[in-house]
Design a protein with these regions (language model features):
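Composition-driven low-complexity repeats that form or flank extended alpha-helical/coiled-coil segments
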Residues: 40-41
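Alpha/beta-hydrolase fold active-site loops
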Residues: 44-45, 101
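Membrane-interface motif at the C-terminal end of an N-terminal transmembrane signal
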Residues: 18-37
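Gly/Ala-rich beta-loop-alpha elbow adjacent to hydrolase catalytic centers
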Residues: 144-149, 153
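N-terminal Sec-pathway targeting helices
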Residues: 1-17
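Short beta-strand element of the alpha/beta-hydrolase
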Residues: 45-52
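Active-site catalytic motif of lipid deacylating hydrolases and related acyltransferases
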Residues: 53-139
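Structural motif
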Residues: 46, 140-142
Length: 153
């Protein structure tokens, strides 16, 4: 059985095309598996707190201080996130590398009462949550909302 020159060229081009697809596919797969692996294996389980109406990201400072005073071993880190009306976020504090249960407080520039404000804050919180999850790769969390902060979840 002989293969014509035309068939040989077509088979060669198909093979080259498949090899050309395989290389970027392999690279893409490795990158995504690495991201998923990092997310899946995360030991970080933050406590995300949202203060109620008229309260700021400083609302839980006393609570965190008291928790750390009574805690043996690694103390809770405190990261405060302020979400501005334009969706911008500013961070203060940090998460210690050895702390698997840091406290993250999310406060809002628009911290006023009212149903329409709570709906806006809920949308802004979703953006903040996604940014935090992307940055810190946690796959679970504990949530605490004080007063209207509980409605934002």
């Amino acid at each position: 059985m002989t293969i014509s020159k035309k068939t040989a060229i077509v088979l060669t081009l198909v093979c080259l095309f498949l090899i050309g697809l395989a290389i970027p596919s392999y690279s893409w797969t490795r990158t995504n598996v690495s991201k998923i692996e990092k997310f899946y294996n995360s030991k970080l389980s933050p406590i995300i707190m949202i203060p109620g109406s008229s309260a700021t990201e400083n609302r839980f400072d006393g609570l965190v201080t008291k928790l750390n005073k009574e805690r043996q071993g690694t103390k809770h880190s405190l990261l405060k996130v302020k979400v501005w009306n334009d969706g911008r976020m500013t961070y203060s504090g940090s998460i210690d590398a050895k702390d698997n249960e840091p406290v993250i407080v999310v406060g809002f520039e628009n911290n006023k009462d009212g149903y329409s404000n709570i709906k806006k804050q809920a949308k802004l919180f979703n953006q903040a949550f996604e940014a935090l999850q992307e940055k810190y790769n946690f796959n679970n969390f504990k949530g605490l909302g004080h007063s209207n902060g509980g409605l934002i979840y």
